[in-house]
């Protein structure tokens, strides 16, 4: 019986991971587009070869987010099994949601967040200093950038556990925030403002 239950849980995990991957791909597409565009231009490769090279860059980027999606799915299953999230729901209980917001708020002020955001704001600088040639060069650069992107946005995306994993409006807001942090002239100020907002939200949920 235990083995059967474990197997069933494993079957359910992958649709959940694919759901998270689809959400991450959709939400990060606006922020990823400037990088994909600049990679294609900077590569200087035209025609079908250029499309193929750009596709490898995008594939590396998506692979990084697939890893995040699997981790998020495992975390959601853990929340459901520990009763921190109702099995039929998509949002953490208030106390756990408060912890998520507090962690996300604190991370907005972390040096790692600032470093990853600086990377995400300078695609041309990255390509000038870290360019890799060869068939797998684009893929490796895409994967590398994807890891930086996760370092910048993982806590933002984790707030979905507190608001609602299937909350379309919150997902749209997160996509807009991720893009604004990257391209807005005062993106670093926005980072700090969001940190304060998340901390206040976490404290309010604890009351």
What are these regions (language model features)?
Residues 107-115, 137-165:
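Alpha-helical transmembrane segments of helical membrane proteins, especially in multi-pass transport
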Residues 1-22, 43-48, 80-90, 110-132, ...:
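Histidine-/acidic- and/or cysteine-rich, low-complexity loops and terminal segments associated
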Residues 1, 16-17, 51-112:
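Membrane helix-loop-helix hairpins that form the core translocation module of multi-pass transporters
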Residues 41-46, 137, 155-167, 176-182:
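Interfacial segments of multi-pass membrane proteins
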Residues 176-200:
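Interfacial loop-to-transmembrane junctions
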Residues 26, 30, 63, 67-79, ...:
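Alpha-helical membrane-inserting segments
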Residues 201-207:
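Juxtamembrane boundary at the C-terminal end of a transmembrane helix
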């Amino acid at each position: 019986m235990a083995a059967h239950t474990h197997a069933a849980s494993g079957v359910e995990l992958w649709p959940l991971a694919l759901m998270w991957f689809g959400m991450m791909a959709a939400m990060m597409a606006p922020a990823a587009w400037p990088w994909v565009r600049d990679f294609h231009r900077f590569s200087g490769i035209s025609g079908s070869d250029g499309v193929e090279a750009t596709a490898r860059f995008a594939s590396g980027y998506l692979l990084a987010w697939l890893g995040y999606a699997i981790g998020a799915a495992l975390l959601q299953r853990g929340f459901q099994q520990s009763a921190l999230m109702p099995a039929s729901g998509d949002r953490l209980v208030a106390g756990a949601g408060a912890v998520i917001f507090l962690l996300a708020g604190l991370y907005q002020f972390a040096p790692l967040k600032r470093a990853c955001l600086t990377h995400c704001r300078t695609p041309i600088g990255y390509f000038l200093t870290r360019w890799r040639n060869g068939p797998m060069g684009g893929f490796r650069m895409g994967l590398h950038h994807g890891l930086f992107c996760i370092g910048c946005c993982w806590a933002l995306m984790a707030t979905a556990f507190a608001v609602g994993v299937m909350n379309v409006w919150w997902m749209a807001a997160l996509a807009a925030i991720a893009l604004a942090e990257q391209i807005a002239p005062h993106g670093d100020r926005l980072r700090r403002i969001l940190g304060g907002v998340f901390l206040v939200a976490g404290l309010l949920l604890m009351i």
